Amino acid sequence: MGRPRAMGGVPTGSPRDEIIAAAGRLFIERGYAQVTMSDIARAAGLQQSSLYYWFRKKELILQATFSVNRVPLEFINRIGARSGSPALKLYRLVRFDTLQLCNSPCDVNELERLAEGQPDLFAGFWEDRQRLHDWVVTLVAAAMEEGQFVDCDPDLVAVSLLSFDEGIQKRFRHQDQHRAGTASAFCHQPRGAEELAEFAAGTMMRALLRRPGDLARLQRQAADFVDDWRVT
């Protein structure tokens, strides 16, 4: 989907990369709409004129955060050729995708709103989204063919599954505002990204598996893939 990668705070030596990292931190702290080019320049330790040398406008910086960081698609390429049932691969993908969204510097819903308004500028965003959607469809169809999943509409499952991940990201990003003891009228227990990722994968598999008892086996198999937790 071209979803953004969590930005590290260590300078890379490249002004362009440092601008993207600084912007990513500001986007997650304040929200995309509230960040100005001046803010980004200051955070990156640059004069605004130097910032414009690398990026003419804020939208291009945001585009860079996902055009060079196609994290779920890289993950798909990594696990696609490996052994394992379609259901196991889908479990791992949902778990990984939820984790990387929770750790992302940008709100995926903000990205989508921006991309909707400027489809030409963000064509790559939608191309990535289509590839991710299609891969989920393929896995669901294969799991149905093998008798692992109940009969269902793979396209509808893909839309619902990816939307579920994105909804979890939204709640994760705002949970500090709703902890017990805050002024919010709505409070809930905060959850870690890994806990939410496991919950998302388990919930989706429980709804799809023809034999719900297979979930425990899938979870045991997925536990062997510790590399899934490294969002790089």
Where are these regions (language model features)?
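C-terminal peripheral helix-coil segments that are non-catalytic and often amphipathic
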Residues: M1, Q130-E145, K170-T232
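Short secondary-structure transition hinges
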Residues: T98-V137, E146-F149, D155-L156
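Helix-turn-helix
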Residues: E18, A22, L26-A64
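Short coil/turn segments at alpha/beta junctions that flank glycine-rich nucleotide-binding fingerprints
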Residues: E29-A33, S83, S104, E146-G147
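Hydrophobic alpha-helical connector segments
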Residues: A64, N77-N103, D107, V157-L161, ...
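Arg/Lys-rich, glycine/proline-spaced intrinsically disordered segments
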Residues: G2-G9
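Short, basic, alpha-helical segments at the C-terminal edge of helix-turn-helix-like DNA-binding modules
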Residues: S67-E74
